[in-house]
Amino acid sequence: MGFTVNYFALISNTCQKIGVKYVSWTCDNPLISMYHVSVFNDCNYIFTFDKTNYLEFKEMGVKHIWYLPLAVDVDRIDMILQKSEDSIKYSGDIAFVGSLYERNSYDRIKPTLPEYLRGYFDAVMEAQLNISGANIVEPMLTTDILEQLQQHFSLEKSEGSFSDLGLIFQTTVLGFKIAEIERRRALIELSKHFRVNVYSNSNVSDLVRVQYCGSVDYWSEMPKVFHESKINLNFTIPNIKSGIPLRIWDVLGAGGFLMTNYQAEIPLYFKEGEDLICFDGVEDLAEKTGYYLEHEKERREIAHNGYEKVKQHHSYVNRIETILETIA
């Protein structure tokens, strides 16, 4: 049996050829490599964390695909936090760990687009930024718009790929630009009123009020940031249509207090207001940030509830057991 995190067509075809099972569990969505004819191979056992993505491939006729949310290794994180002697240097009021996607494809190609398309895409992105928990970009990329776009945007596909212009453009171009706008707007607004620490490889020189803390190692340092910060922020990239991104599990598994945008699958596993806090737009985020900075007891209770929930029900052991039972 072969196993990978995320799906690889070459490995699937190899496993199909030699007659062994190929198990993959996606942590990115949508995973462009899945839009390949090899996804129909009988050897595949594909697990995806986004239910919308699962339903899409199920409707295509992919037989061996299942929905499986991501998880967190609380025991590993507990060990890091217990042994830590430098946690205080990661403390702060508000923390954001992640990319600002300032090096995105949209900024590069925008000058080459006609004025109408630039205005249209700017309007689509602005509309998406005002809607929480749903992706509206895909239906806005109409046949007419895509026909105009293909004159200015070249689509390169590998042999066997059935990804199309709409999928590639909404994912690799608009999706990352929307994420950049959302994150910068939120951090700028919050930094007007609160102390905000940003841990990132991105260029934040234009965010004059934030405290730039450099990047942190995912395995050894990031849990300390989440544990020691009063409020941790998550902004789910719109490419993830309904699923719960890994960052949510990471924060809760470190015992951190989490404020996140709404995702459709959050209510399936967590109680908003008890395990984590959801915000709807920058104004709501700023208001709730002020409230929870002032209400420490409530904030700590919510962080503890989220931690206990992922510890008891959402470990990697739980998920691997599910995978093994499914493929048996």
Predicted regions located by residue number:
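Extended catalytic core of nucleotide-activated donor transferases of GT-like folds
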Residues: 1-61, 74-83, 214, 219-220, ...
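N-terminal pre-catalytic "stem/leader" segment of glycosyltransferase-like enzymes
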Residues: 1-18, 167-172, 196, 302, ...
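A short, gly/pro- and small-residue-rich
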Residues: 15-28, 62, 110-121, 185, ...
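Nucleotide-sugar donor-binding catalytic core of glycosyltransferases
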Residues: 63-64, 69-240, 263-264
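Short beta-strand/turn micro-motifs composed of small residues
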Residues: 4, 26, 48, 98, ...
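Catalytic binding pocket for nucleotide-activated donors in carbohydrate/polymer assembly enzymes
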Residues: 39-40, 51, 55-63, 68, ...
